[in-house]
Amino acid sequence: SISCGESCVYIPCTVTALVGCTCKDKVCYLN
């Protein structure tokens, strides 16, 4: 998995979610 550089501890992935990133272990990851 590639880290998208966005945290999702308090809020879900926002900008990175648009490119397909999902929350895993409090960090947004691609795939």
UniProtKB/Swiss-Prot annotation:
Cross-link entry Cyclopeptide (Ser-Asn), positions: 1-31
Biological-process GO terms, alphabetical: defense response
Domain of life the protein comes from: Eukaryota
Key words of the record: Disulfide bond, Knottin, Plant defense
Pfam family, any one: Cyclotide
Cysteines paired by S-S bonds: 4-21, 8-23, 13-28
PTM (free text): This is a cyclic peptide.
Function (record text): Probably participates in a plant defense mechanism.
Family to which this protein belongs: Belongs to the cyclotide family. Bracelet subfamily.
Comment on protein domains: The presence of a 'disulfide through disulfide knot' structurally defines this protein as a knottin.
Protein name, per record: Cyclotide Hyfl-A
Species this chain originates from: Hybanthus floribundus (Greenviolet)
